């Protein structure tokens, strides 16, 4: 990041006029490479074939003692990838972790020029004290997305339902430029309408720029999960960025009333409304990418299926792969085991195979939404005792939710991360000792609309108790002790219904002892 900024101010009796200019340049580079060696099939079929100590049995269910894990797949193995890889390299005669070139080299350049003007005033209006902060900011942004990518040479069929994207040595540069500008006004006004009661009004227009991942000019492909000749339900997928994305724009309105019934005690109520446009949604397009071809749906796959039918052999992923490999290499179908076919042969696409139709998901600015709610808060200290209490509750509503009863094949846009929250804090602050214990709660919320393709993911309602105690030994030296989630609460995530478990998080309690010294 390279940044230059110049600010100025003209001071008056009732306030000031502030102004400035800014230039900011940012560059983000992402490098990615993949080395893959397929050793055996899914899971561990014959762990005894590996050197002693390479694998350790793992009871997965026992790792989640706070949950009912009945019916959960419980037995697994864990081990050292480096140790197993080194053994396999020596056993089968290949180099472990070959030095492949970077398959993807992506750079995003963002150049921002801004100028602002601000008026800061304080005074009285009909005997009521007020504060006014009003201004406007203009920003111009130029975006350049550069991708230097290794072109895929083909998708190899390495086993029944095992596929691997292989890359050639050719690299290709893709560069896309875009630009946008915004005028961003802002107004904050508060006035003491009666003694100890303050009314606040705020309006602003803000932006949130797309993430760099969404601005990539390159596409990433993922092979299908099985032979497409056997079913129409299996598809290959791809994802790509969109360098022409523009920021989210939000018109924000906030109203609140605060009543101070003591020097450190108050109650407040507020309303907020945010009108947001240019939300990023995913658009799915059926298209071929990089000229890649489907080895599982061409003449060789058709001939293998016909041969299996003629012999009366059940047709599935494994038998089809074995027959294609046998016919292509001139060996008998029954001469090798399934494992030997997988270990000895890969089937590569050729010009007679059909082009793969990928379902390419790319981000686009295509949605708008409204977010609104209320905020209630209160704080009170009990005389000079040092004891106090703070409580707040925030409601969040949105006009676009996820329809769990909709057709799963339809991509839905919905606002994520919206839920009511509440906090209750008991405090002690006197002399050199400060202590707080807090109860924090968050209601159930939608956290993703694409947990798997078009499936939603919900985080269930959750609460935890935290505490913090600190003591000022001197003005400069402070010791502290804190505990987070001291009652050992856990997080559970599910899909369209609570029965569709996605994820369990056993968080546990965390404690920290700290020392801080100010120089």
Where are the regions that the model predicts?
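Transmembrane beta-strands of outer-membrane beta-barrel pores
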Residues: 12-14, 21-29, 136-144, 203-209, ...
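Repeated loop/turn-to-beta-strand initiation elements of outer-membrane beta-barrel proteins
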Residues: 15-17, 126-130, 196-199, 264-267, ...
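Residues on the lipid-exposed face of transmembrane beta-strands in outer-membrane beta-barrel proteins
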Residues: 6-10, 115-121, 187-191, 245, ...
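Gram-negative outer-membrane beta-barrel transporters
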Residues: 273-275, 285, 291-450, 487
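Outer-membrane beta-barrel signature, preferentially recognizing the C-terminal barrel domain
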Residues: 100, 104, 108-110, 178, ...
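Flexible glycine-rich, low-complexity coil/linker segments exposed to the extracellular/periplasmic environment
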Residues: 1, 43-102, 160-172, 229-240, ...
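C-terminal beta-signal and adjacent terminal beta-strands/loops
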Residues: 41-44, 277, 441-449, 470-519
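Outer-membrane beta-barrel strand-turn architecture
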Residues: 11-14, 123-126, 183, 191-195, ...
């Amino acid at each position: 990041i390279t940044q230059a900024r110049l600010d100025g101010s003209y001071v008056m009796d009732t306030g000031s006029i502030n102004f400035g200019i800014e230039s900011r340049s940012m560059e983000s580079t992402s490098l990615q490479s993949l080395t893959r060696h397929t050793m055996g099939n899914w899971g561990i079929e014959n762990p005894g074939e590996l050197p002693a100590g390479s694998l350790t049995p793992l009871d997965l269910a026992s790792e989640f003692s706070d949950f009912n894990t009945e019916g959960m797949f419980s037995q697994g193995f864990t081990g050292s990838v480096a140790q197993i890889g080194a053994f396999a390299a020596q056993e089968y005669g290949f180099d472990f972790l070959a030095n492949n070139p970077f398959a993807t080299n992506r750079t995003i350049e963002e150049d921002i020029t801004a100028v602002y003007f601000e008026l800061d005033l304080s005074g009285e209006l009909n005997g009521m004290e007020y504060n006014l902060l009003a201004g406007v900011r203009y920003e111009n942004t130029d975006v350049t997305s550069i991708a230097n990518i290794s072109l895929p040479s083909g998708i190899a069929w390495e086993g029944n339902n095992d596929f691997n994207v292989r890359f050639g040595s050719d690299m290709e540069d893709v560069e896309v430029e875009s630009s946008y500008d915004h005028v961003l006004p802002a107004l904050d006004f508060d006035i003491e309408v009666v003694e100890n009661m303050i009314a606040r009004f705020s309006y602003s227009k803000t932006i949130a720029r797309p993430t760099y991942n969404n601005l990539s000019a390159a596409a990433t492909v993922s092979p299908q999960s099985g032979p497409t000749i056997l079913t129409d339900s299996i598809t290959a997928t791809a994802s790509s960025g969109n360098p022409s994305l523009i920021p989210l724009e939000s018109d924000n309105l906030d109203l609140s009333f605060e009543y101070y019934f003591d020097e450190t005690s108050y109650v407040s109520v507020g309303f907020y409304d945010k009108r947001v446009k240019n939300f990023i949604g995913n658009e799915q397009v059926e298209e071929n990418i990089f000229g890649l071809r489907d080895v599982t749906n061409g003449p060789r796959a058709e001939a293998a299926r016909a041969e299996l039918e003629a012999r009366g052999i059940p047709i599935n992923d494994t038998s089809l792969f074995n027959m294609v490999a046998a016919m292509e290499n001139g060996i008998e179908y029954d001469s090798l085991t399934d494992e030997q076919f997988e270990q000895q042969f890969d089937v590569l696409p050729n010009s007679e195979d059909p082009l793969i139709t990928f379902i390419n998901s790319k981000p686009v600015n295509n949605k708008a939404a409204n977010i609104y709610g209320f905020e209630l808060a209160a704080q009170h200290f009990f005389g000079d005792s040092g004891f106090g209490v703070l409580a707040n509750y925030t409601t969040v509503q949105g006009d676009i939710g996820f329809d769990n009863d909709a057709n799963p094949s339809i991509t839905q846009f919905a606002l994520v991360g919206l839920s009511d929250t509440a906090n209750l804090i008991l405090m002690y602050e006197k002399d050199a000792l400060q202590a707080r214990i807090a109860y924090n709660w968050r209601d159930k919320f939608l956290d993703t609309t694409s947990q798997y393709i078009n499936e939603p993911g919900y985080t269930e309602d959750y609460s935890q108790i935290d505490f913090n105690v600190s003591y000022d030994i001197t003005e400069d030296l402070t010791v502290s002790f804190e505990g987070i989630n001291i009652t050992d609460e856990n997080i559970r995530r599910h899909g369209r219904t609570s029965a569709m478990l996605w994820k369990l998080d056993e968080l546990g309690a965390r404690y920290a002892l700290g020392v801080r010294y100010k120089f």
